């Protein structure tokens, strides 16, 4: 988008860009409202020890308070007693600086971020199959030319409306759109074929699709032989998923499975995309892997116009997971337990590799350990609101309250900031330069329109200020520059040679080329719009199959909790709603939480449209008005997760996590529903 | 915990039990003795193997291996010595067990017809049960032009469909008046016969066979009505009988199958039986789903993962799905009695549905042909969930009242509050107001309201409203 500022304020204009082609949803149009919002924080807040209330304070007082506490906690309880929690909305520069701050200034292993809640399962599945995790290994425009496009657990019509322009183009061109979703979403309504499985059964659906492809002879045997390894084990495991078995489990008719397999197996350009619906399960990595297996067996990845991809969620969902705010990661998508990676990054940072901490624990495990005898006693939060967004949120809220020190940097008083001991007001999007990396692996520029308001500092400045107080001021100033361009220059060096190699990218090149696709190792060499044409990112260049099997959800329905509960987004709100709930037009469009349920179920429960209902799980309850819809299965209820308080969907969700990615099972748990 | 488990049988039940044990914690040695010399395979796929579209490796199943699993295909067990807790194998080896599991399956029944000696069948006469049977059928079918399948039950029809797909002129001979009489009512059987005829399978009903004459050149099947049918191949699909020989010889309680309790225990507490060879509560299973459920329960009990696990039979769904055939039968659809009955029949298009509902639950259903709600019906039956208030949903699927409100034919009939552009929450009223304030083109209305600037999906609808506004003389709009 392009911004214009005049006497009346800042206004937003759509921009013809290769990804959105001028499209903006309501959140984009109204985003400037947040710049001068009356709720904007413009001064640090310190919790008054006597009254217990947050009171305005000077920056020096706030930063001194933080530094003093951090030093005391680390000297008494060790370096890991301080933890850092980041966000997938931070720019690449900020995500990079945050990871470096944790490892170099705090020297704690405990850093992770909210991307663990929304992309980590696809990331893990992509890494183990392809050796590379880039949301789409091809340009978004390929979607518009696909003969067959399978969307699994993705609802872009509500979560990413401009992307739907590509779907429209695809279908106008005669392509077939198939959507897998337990609900008849706005996206599913546009599909030629909608598979509506019981939540938690997408993996079985994928295995049955591959079973059919095998029995119909649609597997690309030459590709499997030349470009992959491990297929025999997958072939044997999907032999046990004959379509009627998957039908009974998922409710998807065999005829629909066959039609889907045929469209995938006999189409020319075929793309399979997964999103949160496939990922947010305790078996999310395996579920995504099942669709990756299907794509590999059909010979899609690396074939121009075809492929597998993941629709990344947050603003900088891709870049945010590449440069070191993940517990096990160093910049350039390197592993923190890889000695060569440690040497390289430590060299760039000017510290001995041995001084870098080892891997920490994934987000939920980290949050759940806060304030416990062996867990961190202090937490610094940047760009995240776990009180609303974490699963089993009431428990996490309790953990945050048990901390000795909670620091939250945000532009608004989020629900998490409201619990903090120190709140630091930060700059926001139109006030900072930097880069983001979109779902295509395309590095984009964000340009500052104007400086932050008086009293507000950037995240980079906050990290520099804290580093100066925690160590030698001169060293800190060199290590933590506040200018994003300087940080990006260092990020380039740190990422050089890594999987996500930014070494050849500079801001001017991004401006000239409408973004630059990583890997881009050299300033005078090409970038990489398409991955995998010749080889995959594994040591031997072959993609890896992994045999995966369906398993039940961590919590299945029972007599006491007889209904499936699933969560998701609505168009006019975003994430924990801290920002979008404060925009009047968005509030009008989606004013409050709701519980979506089928009219048959509602009738049995004596619930009318609009009645207040209570959804109860083993972990908590949610109260919101009923919204009746025949687009949801009668055995399943849905609630959006953008609201706090009584309408907080995450009071109900399960905190079971995927054993590989650590992603929580937001998409399925067992509940009972009654009139409130 | 049980230290040494010996499983006799590496079929669908035995192999599954080995995998279930493998997946559970604990230290134990599991020996799987399979009489067949093959890797574990999926019997359900054998009819697809007959079509020639897949090869033998495609029917192989994942085998539990390593971690204490000793898998020995091609090792038949000849005796069980209960006092010594040993089994004896074909080559005389003795293998000790702490717990023995019989998963010996069932054998194909060779009907008592003149010309058929079960121990020495002619080369062109083959039962349809095992992978070796399949190989023999394929060996004969290769170069054959015609086949007869004796038996019009589920397996016989699958075999016939597979052979017809290979291009063989195939005839099914069935002794009763309609196909799959255990699952279907006569009307459904007739629709199914019509469907099969369309796929090139000839059906001969209500004619018992009386004898078989076979030599190197062909097979003749004599029928009770005096006719004789000639073909290159005769496939026997006349049911199966539990393989209880070991259990009987060992003195275990055997009726039709090896009698087991809810824990799958036989009359010897150190011996269990699962799958087709077992008889639970007077019933034989004969299908994969109950066999796998038994394997799960037995693994829970044997490993102590859930010592209280008990096998509870669930109602079974019979499913026949192949190119051109889509059949599901469950429960008692034709039983009559109290309750509601839903029916739909379109024989010309091969569609038939009959469902019985009692106390808001499905108690039986027969669905044949194009039934879009088939997945829903199976799940409602399997899980015992209440049926939709509007029963038509069971016949017509979600085509009924499903996806959102259809756009109104005319903008005049749309309420002002109707949201035209979802992405930017623009109502019809907002578009009208924009037009009234001077916007006279689609682009101007879009610029003024942002309608159509998100996903772009409503551009046509917005255009339609602008056209209507241009033509209408005066439009009232509520604020």
Residue ranges of predicted features:
Chain B
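Beta1-alpha1 glycine-rich phosphate/pyrophosphate-binding loop at the start
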Residues: 1-70, 160-183
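FAD-binding core/adjacent interface of flavoenzyme oxidoreductases
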Residues: 1-2, 6, 62-148, 222-224, ...
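Mid-to-C-terminal Rossmann-like scaffold of FAD/NAD(P)H-dependent oxidoreductases
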Residues: 2-4, 277-375, 402-425, 429-430, ...
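Glycine-rich Rossmann-fold phosphate-binding loop(s) that bind the pyrophosphate
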Residues: 9-12, 129, 150-153
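A Rossmann-like FAD-binding core segment of flavoenzymes
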Residues: 27-31, 71-89, 95, 165-260, ...
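FAD-site-proximal beta/loop scaffold in flavoenzymes
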Residues: 120-144, 214-222, 227-293, 297, ...
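A short, polar/charged loop-to-alpha-helix boundary motif
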Residues: 371-389
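Local cysteine-cluster metal-coordination motifs and their immediate loop/turn environment
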Residues: 417-431, 447-466
